[in-house]
């Protein structure tokens, strides 16, 4: 299977030209190319997410961390009387360069798509706040993976005839989810639940081209179209350790350490497939006639096993700095598609990142860039797609969080829009592997925090 993957990637040739949609031969295996399971805010810090949440005593980031639902409890926790709603949307532009050392070739692809849409509602009451409790909920939609490839390969058979092979695939996996997070004193717990759904369509078209008979094309088509879906659930926990308090106001935390964990058990998705194996013939006008249906089976029921995953991390925060580190693990060896294993393997990733916020309590609001948050990070791990050799996956990231508001409102972070950006430069493979993929991903996120659904007290 791994050798087949290598051949397919090398065979891409000029098919992988820059376009509006990604053309990745890696997406032929497993559930496709996995999309980042992080919002733009955390992507700028290498993707650390397990222990990130807004703290009531620090300047908020106003972004919804869907990776660990326990973090929802931090939304607007500092101002329980204000029921501001956060709308969070992320988009990204990917540019990929795939390199093969033997033979020496280079292919490129580009794509733009929406990373996530989500909205969060704080539910904390004043009575809950008095008991050091906070609560919030969210709803959202995000992609889990993408499948999109078109690979062509031609070869001579007997010196006078040719065989043309076309591999095509499309689809992907998405999640529509509802989340809630509750914090009691220093402990937070949360849960995401919803529906995971998608499609996985594959076809292999073999065309025998006769050089001795004019305009004769003899083609076989093998195609499978699968739709699937099912309920999913994941959860998370966080705990805060106050390392220091304000000398004048002992109830205010000035240094905090948070630990977090999140994950999901193995999920079973119900699937339905339509399979066809047919022989067709192309005429000189480009049309075709079905000569024979070798095999056809409709509405074949089965299951897809989505593997268990877990992540844990810790994060330090004070008025100006935030540091964090995460460890992630995916049990992809248990992935099954209609009972069949695939070219996938267990994978792990380590992430680390930091954020710097220059503004202090006495910073003049005229100094706009002191109110911008600056981020950087990196990640290193193994790819879940299995090839002939272990391929590391690593990258470096930088990002910003820029308030979009007038200068006079910079001191009121709960009442403005934040533009988050993240630039990722990543790699799949190294000098020891025949195939390397370079990635440049630019992400933009908009977090809008406003009292959208509140009735005015006065007309």
Regions found by a protein language model. Give the residues of each.
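Bacterial Sec-dependent N-terminal signal peptides
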Residues: 1-25, 139, 459
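Subset of outer-membrane beta-barrel
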Residues: 21-459
């Amino acid at each position: 299977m791994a050798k087949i993957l290598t051949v397919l990637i090398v065979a891409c040739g000029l098919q992988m030209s820059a376009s509006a949609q990604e053309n990745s031969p890696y997406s032929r295996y497993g559930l496709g190319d996995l999309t980042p399971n992080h919002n733009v805010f955390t992507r700028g810090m290498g993707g650390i997410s397990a222990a990130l949440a807004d703290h009531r005593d620090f300047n908020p980031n106003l972004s919804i961390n869907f990776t660990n639902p326990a973090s929802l409890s931090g939304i607007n926790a500092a101002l329980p009387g204000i029921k501001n709603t956060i709308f969070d949307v992320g988009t990204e532009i990917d540019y990929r360069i795939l390199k093969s050392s033997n033979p020496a070739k280079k292919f490129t692809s580009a794509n733009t798509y929406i990373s996530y849409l989500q909205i969060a509602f704080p539910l904390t009451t004043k009575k809950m706040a008095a008991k050091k409790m906070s609560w919030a909920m969210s709803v959202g939609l995000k992609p889990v993976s993408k499948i999109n490839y078109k690979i062509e390969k031609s070869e001579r058979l007997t010196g006078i005839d040719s065989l043309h092979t076309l591999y095509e695939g499309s689809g992907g996996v998405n999640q529509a989810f509802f989340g809630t997070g509750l914090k009691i004193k220093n402990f937070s717990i949360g849960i995401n639940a919803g529906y995971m759904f998608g499609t996985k369509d594959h076809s292999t078209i073999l065309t025998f081209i006769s050089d001795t008979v004019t305009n004769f094309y003899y083609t076989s088509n093998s195609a499978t179209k699968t739709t699937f879906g099912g309920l999913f659930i994941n959860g998370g926990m966080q705990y805060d350790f106050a390392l220091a308090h304000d000398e004048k106001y002992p109830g205010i935390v000035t240094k905090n350490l948070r630990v977090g964990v999140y994950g999901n058990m193995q999920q079973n998705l119900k699937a339905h497939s339509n399979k066809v194996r047919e022989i067709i013939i192309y005429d000189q006008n480009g049309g075709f006639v079905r000569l024979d249906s070798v095999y056809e089976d409709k509405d074949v029921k089965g299951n897809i096993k989505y593997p268990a995953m877990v992540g844990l991390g810790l994060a330090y925060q004070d008025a100006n700095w935030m540091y964090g580190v995460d460890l992630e693990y995916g049990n992809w060896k248990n992935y099954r598609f209609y009972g069949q294993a695939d070219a996938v393997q267990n994978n792990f990733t380590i992430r680390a990142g930091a954020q710097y916020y220059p503004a202090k309590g006495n910073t003049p609001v005229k100094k706009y860039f002191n109110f911008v948050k600056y981020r950087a990070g990196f990640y290193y791990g193994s790819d879940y797609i299995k090839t002939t050799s272990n391929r590391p996956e690593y990258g470096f990231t930088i990002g910003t969080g820029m308030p979009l508001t007038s200068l006079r409102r910079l001191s009121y972070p709960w009442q403005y829009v934040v533009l988050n950006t993240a630039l990722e430069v990543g790699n799949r493979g190294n000098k020891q592997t025949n195939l390397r993929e370079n990635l440049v991903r630019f992400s933009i996120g908009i977090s809008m925090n406003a009292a959208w659904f509140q009735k005015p007290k006065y007309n």
